Amino acid sequence: MAKLIINEENKKSRIEPEIYGHFSEHLGRCIYEGIYVGEKSEIPNVNGMRTDVVDALKELKVPVLRWPGGCFADEYHWMDGIGPKEKRKKMINTHWGGVVEDNSFGTHEYMELCRQIGCKTYVNGNLGSGTVREMSEWVEYMTFEGVSPMADLRKENGHEAPWKVDYFGVGNENWGCGGNMTPEYYANEYRRYQTYVRNYHPDRPTKKICCGANVADYYWTKGVLNTAFDHAEQWHGFMDGLSLHYYVHPEGWEIKGSSTDFDADVWYKTLSKALYMETLIERHGAIMDEYDPDKKVGMIVDEWGTWYTCEPGTNPGFLYQQNTVRDALVAGITLNIFNKHSDRVKMAALAQMVNVLQSVLLTEGGQMIKTPTYHVMHMYRHHQGADLLESTLTGAGEIGSDEWKVPKITESVSMDKDGVITVTMNNLSVEASEKVEIQLANRGYHVVEARIVTDSDMHAHNTFEAPDTVTEKDFAAYEETENGVNVTMPANSVIELRLAK
């Protein structure tokens, strides 16, 4: 039997709510159809935003939403997306399917979406093909409340008060689709552009996010920080966060693998690659420690998730994929890693929110379904804003094939402001249940809530015909002990226990 020892007396780092953030790009059916259907649609909506989608996202307690990209961000010109919709310029979405982008969803619509969801804003600016002036004027348009050309233009377009821009990304993937830059060149451009991302209101500052590495490109991290911090140590390289992007491709980049047709070996390969996130955080974090030992700069994992071969019969540029119990495990594993490293990881964004990659929601016409990933993130929402607790897992062992060994169990534990402890655990075994003895430092805790996402079939997923095949359910396979609880975790499972005195 595995043993999980929890020391609730040792509170570690705060798990920022933004770790549970999301990403929505002008890609496929994420924005259009998935979120925004327009005011004249027969699908129920408020100011063009699907009511069913917004309600589901509010249940999820989405803390922050990144927009408009992604690769789309570095070819997006924000002024084309304001003013009367019939007068907005159209453009080609060159990265994603070559479709026509009519710009009917722009700055005002994004801010309205965030208002309806109740989340913070994360706007990604165009450094790759845009000018310093364009970026500066966008920030002025959104955040300045006095008299200025851009503030006046915002008012003319119907929004008197400025918005709060919580985070601003100065470019995206500038090592690739955002300009194919070298780290030194990008860092110098970052220093220049961010100068004009003005904080007009120090009482509600906009935090600036610098473009970080793709996967294991430690050379990029070192080069960017070395240049950004040059003669700027006291300003932490002019940044509040440094991004990291990592996707799980079971079979590789060219042929990624099916979302629903896989065997046990590919199951373990996928989970092993999900676990690689911890190595990336530790190694990039070690480089960040050289320049920022006090951890003033947050690691921002603002693109993560599974990326499979798109569903047969769909546009390859739309990145539409199904979502199984395997994805639920990937989500649970990854979120536990983020929690464990919340001293450095301050924000993350699952890619993407609706109809693209590892979505939490899928839509088809007026229908909407919640994916297994949605249900995991719904359980894990209790970690938001809580304090990570010291926890040690022993005796669990490993499972998998010779090439793709994974730990049988992963976990993280937190305590909220009311003293309620949240334990989230994953059983990575595709066939065997696992018993876990949970011990706490103090007695008197009782289970006040227990939930599970699982299915005996590792391929199980939700469809529009069967939307509740994999869902969140009450969990009863536990027994309270004198100073803890014994749990029997089914195979392929993600569980949450809530403990209180």
Language-model segments: residues:
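Non-catalytic accessory regions flanking glycosidase/transglycosidase catalytic cores in CAZymes
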Residues: 1-241, 277-310, 314-501
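Histidine-centered active-site/metal-ligand motif
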Residues: 245
